[in-house]
Structure formats: structure tokens, C-alpha cells
Amino acid sequence: MEKCRARSPHPETGFGNGFVAVVEILFYFLRQRLYPARSMTVQDAISNLEKWKSIARSLTLLLALAAINPCAQATKISPDVDEVFDLYCYNCHDDLVQKGEVDLIALPELDQDARLELLNRIEEQVYLSQMPPKNKEQPTATEKEQLLAWVSESFAALGAKSEFREKLHEPEFGNYVDHDKLFSGEIKEMPFSPARRWLISPYIFDRKIQSIVGRAAAELEIMNPMHLPDVSGVRDYDNKIAGGDHFVTMLANANAIADHQLAIISPEKFKAAESKRAALLSRITDYESSNPNHPFLPSFREELAKLEKEIKEAKEAARKEAKIDAPFRTITTKPTPPGEAEMKAAILHQYALVYDREPNPSELAGCLKLLQESIAKVGNTQGLKRMLMAVLLQPDFLYRSELGEGPEDEYGRRRLSSREASYAIAYALTERGPDKLLKLAAQRDQLKTKQQYQKHVERLLAAPGGKILIDDRTPTARTRGYSTLQPAKLRFFREFFGYSKAYQIFKDNKRFEGATHRENRNSHEIAIRQMINEADLMVDRILERDENVFQELLTSNRFYLYHNGDNEEAQKILAERKRLLEKMAGDYQEMKPKEFWETYKLDLDVQFGINSRGKMDQDVVAEIDRRMKSIPLERELIIYPKRYTPHIRIPVRDGMMAKNRTNMFNIDHNTWSYVAEQPFEIPNRMGILTHPTWLTAHSLNTSTDPVKRGKWVREKLLAGFIPDVPISVDAAIPEDHNKTLRQRLHDKTKAESCWKCHESMNPLGYAFEMYDDFGRFRQEEELEYPEHLIIEAPDDGPYTRNTYKTMPLDTTGYLMGTGNPALDGKVKDALDLIDRLAKSDRVRQSIIRHAFRFFMGRNELLSDSQTLIAADQAYLESGGSFNAVIVSLLTSDSFMYRR
């Protein structure tokens, strides 16, 4: 049985050995000396220099102690373990033969560091069944458990932690937990999650700031200190802690928020105007000293006076418009120091605003003392500001607390308190704090049973709040991001599939057929961001239907292209556009070119990409003439279901940008007859794994990447794992101008030392070679080298892609690891591979494992077996409802209990 990681509510007190112990003891010491009460802040602590001197002396002593490395207790190889080693290991790893430079016989004689390193290697190889090699006799399950137990005992005897066991809690090592054991039903242990304080996500942080300052958040330029790893997969885990960079950012944030709360006019708010004023004043001073009669001086002085007046009026207006909450205003407007009751009212109000609760006695006492001392030193307003900042700077602002404050059960687990549960449910589904009904349930202590949890989970799934921008990295000055009513669900699949990372892969616009350089509006960067929005739309609509979700995501051949999902609006606008174009064609015959340009330049911009902000030169005249003479068209023009108004100076183009993104689906936008009813079938496609965004995200800058694509399938869908690449390995694929990428990759990885890992990736990734690195379907591979150039296309215009000599593609691959012999075997191409994957129980269960990690914020343990089995059954019994999976997970013991 796997030993679960025990995490106390205060993990910083769990000391280890060596330098790690020094650091842990130091931080414990710092916490005790600098934060004796939760209400104290770093600002209070750093004022006492004597404490820092004491800390420095203690650190010197601790470092000296750490430098002393006493001889550790010998690691004994027990007779039972020695027998297992003799059966399976000594032939290659003894005093005579040391493959991989490993001598197990010498283990007891090694110094502590070398011994720990070897124990970690043994544990990892045995745990992952990588040793003995697959072609050798394997130890039984009992023998493996015997070896692993001995390794754990050896670490304990040395007073050390297993590095391998520690990294099992990192996101990239989640699949190391035995999949078959998780779903076999043999594990009967009652599920739980470790007691924890979990850093909030950047999305929760944004909503938290909005709840405090409302719409002023953007104006205040609050910086978000929360960052998630930029990887494909679940990213928000509970094993991160706040550091110095978090504190520095929050210090600036707290200052800005407190200024806003008290209507203090911050210099930052008028920084631009003040800078302009200073520059103008400097210029006037220079002129006055060098040439007092300069003709520009009067106008400069007039401009300065006008600017100073504007700044003064703006500050006055800001003061008048500012709304200070009553408990704060009582103190800031009082000519004398406030009384204790007034101070307590301000403290209670700030806690209610920031934490939606009352301070505990210790917090109240600490804040009251701080407020009294601060007001005595710097006055009412600035003293109050210090207290407001202190509350904002408490650890609770950045952490979600899930310690399990409920009663303990017979299994040693503690249920989340109703308040803890209200936040856990709200954060999981809405990325914001509890709504009114959850708050009420927490106040009444009505979040204690599965039924009570289920009631609120189902309610929030059925009636989500307003639309939320799913990713603030995707929008640019020219593009908008996708907004959804179900952020948590969409975010999970975005992270799971990783298609939203496509915009990070730089592509050459010339290779992106159809790109033009005019205003860069048809660049690949613009196109792929719009494609990400359409992939979001596809996933969002499948989630809304909530039927056979996993299979639909993997196998649907219906996609969105140049669409926002509103079919009714699309039909109306298409009919209107037809009538408009016919009118434009008629007016073109009657109007003079300049009159026509002034009348229809916005429509020409929106529909034909003729720049409405440019001048009407000869090129524009020729383009208008060509377009108007082509009406009526034999095809449907591309439209985007969004209305435009002639009253705006610059069109809000949204989807009207980058019409040439259609070519990623092998559709020529110059000849395509637009489909208003979407999603619609696109040939040679099957699900998200054939969407151009996923294919681009899992490619290189100038080529496909079978390794990356195959690794994703192995890890995300087949619950497999690929060991880390040794640092000494050169992973670059050698150039050969007369071979396909597959041939070159095979030559590079066919050696036994490489193939033992690449056999789990390459055969899966090869199947996707039917798509290029832009996601375009292909049957041949172009050899994009100068000596193979056939036609060189212009750098600008409707077609910019060069034509090269090609070679036939081999898209066959091999599927292994589904656990189903009927599905494993040779595959024809990506479509064949995906079709088989979608039928696999292991694939379904693997997606559920990742959903568990997303909603629990951690990797699964063997003790979570019953939770995962229940979620899998919920999906099957509900006809493939992802909502059913979520309800199952958020009402499970893994979610409700802590230990």
C-alpha cells in the first residue's frame, strides 16, 4: 500500500537533514520571531533591527552545524532484500559488473550522499518497473513491495526524505501512480486530501481584487503576483508557496488599494500629467535663462497654466467622486483620534471586505494595537491606511485554507468546516468566492453531508454567473479572447489538451499561405489567436450539450470557422450582406470613385480587407473595381456574425481579421463559399487532436514534432510516463535534405538506448504526420530546402507559399498500452489512432485522473481509488456527462475530508 504524504497545517515545521534542515529551521525561526500573531506584518517586523541581529547570529550557528556531517548509520541489506537482489540485480550491478556504474554490493560502504543518491535511483527504477529490463525475468508484486519497503526504511534510518517520493507530488509525475491499481477496486482505504493551505490561482486573485475595489481594479493597475507554470496540462497545484516576489508585489498592491479605499490621491494616478507638467516647466526654465524673449515662451506659460488647472480640477473631481465607506470616513474626517469602538468598527469592516469574515480575537487585538500606534505617529488617515494594508498583507489573502476544521471521524480524517467547504466549492466551479446561497449555507453550518454539497454543486453547474474572459493572454490590440459562462470546465480542457499554447509557437508568415504584410492583419499570429477562440467555442458547445463529452471532443468532425456560434445571427447578417453588396455594385456604376470610397469604405474594409484608414490611391481604386465587378458572386462571402456600425472610426473586426486562417483547414478563403450554419463537417478531421490549434501547439517553429505529439498521447490519454531526458543526450534531429522528418527522426532514435523511451512516443506521433506544422492536411511532405525549390512565390499577395519538391508520407503508427488487445496494434493514420483511443476505457479513465488533479489541486494517491472509480461510473451511467464527473469529484471523500 502506498504511503501517503503527511502534510501538517504548518509544513514549514517539518525539518529534514543537512542544508534543507537549516533552511527549514531558519524559516520556522523567522516565522516565530517575526510573526508571533497572525495580524503582524513584515512592516512591523523589519522595524526591529535587534531581531535581525539575533537571526544573523542564529543563521551563522546553524550553517556551522550543517557543515558538520557525522557518519550516518549504516544501511543494512536484509537477507530477504539480498535474496531479491541476487535473483534479479547482482548479475549486472555487483562488485564485478557495474552497468550504469551501479554497485549494489558497495551500498552499505558508501558515504551518506552517495548512498542517498543510489537509494533514490533504486526506488525510482523499481517503482516504475524499469529495472530489471523488460526482456529479463521480473520480480513479483510481493518482491517489489519488499524492496520498496526496505528503501523507505533506509531513508528513515538516515533521517532523510526520498527525492523520488517527493517529486511524485509534482504535476508531471502524476502518472507514476499505478493506473491499474487505481481502477481495480482492490484499494479499500478511505480517501482524503492532506490538510493544506493552497495558493490561489491568478484567476481567483483577479476576482478577489474586483470584489474589493470593483471596476477600479484596472485603473489602480493592480499587479497579479500569481503565476502558473507555462505547460500543457493541469497547472494549478497546491504545492506552491508564496515567496519574496509575491510580497513585494502585494506591498505595492496593498498601498494602491488602501489609497483607493480612503480616496487618497496617489501620485501614480496623475503620473503622466505630472510628467508632462515637469517637462514643460523645465523647458520654460531653460528658455527663461537662455532667451527670456523667446517667442514660444508666452504659449508655453499659457499651456502650463492650463495643464496645472486641469490637474487641480481632476484631483478635486476625484476627491468628490470618491466614496469612502462609513467606518473609514468616521476616522478620516475626525479632527481628534478615534475611540476604540470606532477603530474596531473599521477593522471589522476591512475584514468583511477582504476576507468575508470577522477577525479572530488575536487578529483583532493585533490590528487594534497597530491602528492605535499608527494614528499616534502619523495621524488618522495615514494610520488607518497602515491598518488597511496590514489586513491586505496577511497570508490568508493569497492562500485558500483547507485544514479540515470539522470533527474527526473514525479514520482519523477531519471534514472541511462549512465555511471551508463554501470556498472550496466556489473556487472549484466559479473561480471567485462563495455566492449568497453558499454563504448562507456556511453560516447555518449546512455543508456537512454529500447531499448538501451536491445541492450547491449542481446549482452552480446549472446556473453559472456572467461570462468570463477565459485567457487574458490571447487578446491583442487586434484580437479578442473567448468568454465563457463555464470557466472552470473550459479551462480544464484548455489545459488538458494544451491547444491554447499554439500562439506561442512562432511561424513564418510566408510559409503560412495567403499571408500579406499590409497592416499584418493576415499574419499567422493573428490567425492562430482567432483559431484558439474557435477551438474554445467548439469545446464550450460540447460541454454545454454534456453528452458523450470525451468521445465528442476526440472524434467530432464538426468544427467552427470564422464564426461566433450564433447561427441565427449569421443567417441574418449573411442576407443583409448580400443585399448590401448588390446595392454597392449598383452604386459603383453611378457614383464617382471618391464618393463611393467615402460612402462605403467601412464596408469595403470589413468585407474585403481594403484599409479604411488608408488613402484612396491607385491600388485601392483598382482593388475596388475588381471587387465590384465580381458581384454577384457564385459563392457565399465570408462574414462574421457580428454587426458593424458606420459611426465607429475603426471597425471592431474580431473574426474579420485573418480570413486566410481558413487555409489551416485546407480551405482557400479566396474561393470558399461561407457556411453560415456551424459547426460544419470538415474532411480529414476528427476532434481536437486534428484541430489546427492542437497540431500547432504540438509542433516546432518550422516543422512538425512527432515526439511531442506522441508524448502527449502517451501521457494524457494512456496514463503513461516518459522518463526525463538525460542531460547528456543531444535531442536535435540531424539535417538531411533528401529525407522526410520521420526518416530523420527514426535514424536519430533507433539506437537501443534511445528507443527504450521513444518506442512509447514515436509510433503514436508518426500517425499525425498527415498534418503539417500549421495543422494543414497533407499527403506528401515538402522538402523545404533551396535546392528543392520549384516555384518561388511573392512575399506579398493572396498566395505567398513557395512550392517545393515532395516525398511520399508514411503516416502509419502503432498503438500499445490501451489494455485492450482489440484496440492495440498497427494504425493507418491519426484518424484510425484517434478512433481507437476514443473507444478505450483507459483513455476515459486517464481523462478522469486529470480532472481529479484539476479540481483537487494535487496528484491522486492510491487511497483516492474509490473516488476515481465513482467518477468513472458517474460518467458512464450519465451518458458521458462531464457535469456528472464534477459532481462525483466535488462530493467525494477526497474533496470533503483532510488528514
Regions found by a protein language model. Give the residues of each.
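Soluble non-cytosolic domains of exported or imported proteins
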Residues: 79, 83, 138-142, 337-345, ...
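Extended surface/linker regions that mediate inter-domain or inter-protein docking
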Residues: 150, 162-164, 170-316, 337, ...
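Second-shell loop/turn segments in exported
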Residues: 135, 330-337, 349-357, 371-378, ...
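Aromatic- and Gly/Pro-enriched helix-to-coil junctions and flexible linker segments
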Residues: 72-286, 290, 302, 309-326, ...
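Short, solvent-exposed loop/turn and secondary-structure capping segments
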Residues: 94-104, 134, 159-164, 361-363, ...
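Bacterial N-terminal signal peptides
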Residues: 57-67
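N-terminal secretory signal peptides that target proteins for export/translocation
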Residues: 1-54
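Sequence context surrounding c-type heme c attachment/ligation sites in exported
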Residues: 71-146, 677-830, 834-838, 844, ...
